Amino acid sequence: MLDILKNNWSDAQIVDVSYQKGTLLLALKDYQNTIHKYLFENVIALSFENYLNEDISEIHSSFWKEENDTICQIDILSAWTNKEIVSFSFFTH
């Protein structure tokens, strides 16, 4: 299981999304104001809306096979609108 999926992220916020050359750095701040940073490599798709200071309701994941590769998609939902504020897909190892 991915580390990001092990926590309950309700009342957390996205504080940074940085993308460069197929690598995504995602920083989340939990309700105790602790910053958690996650690095994802081999990112093949990324979309986001205005996410700063937006509370998270939950994080969804899905996995599927494409030829010989496994792909994971992560969707982060807004607590206010329940819509995706960040979504990305990447090849897993």
Placement of each model-derived feature along the sequence:
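Surface-exposed, interaction-prone regions used to assemble/regulate multi-protein complexes
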Residues: M1-H93
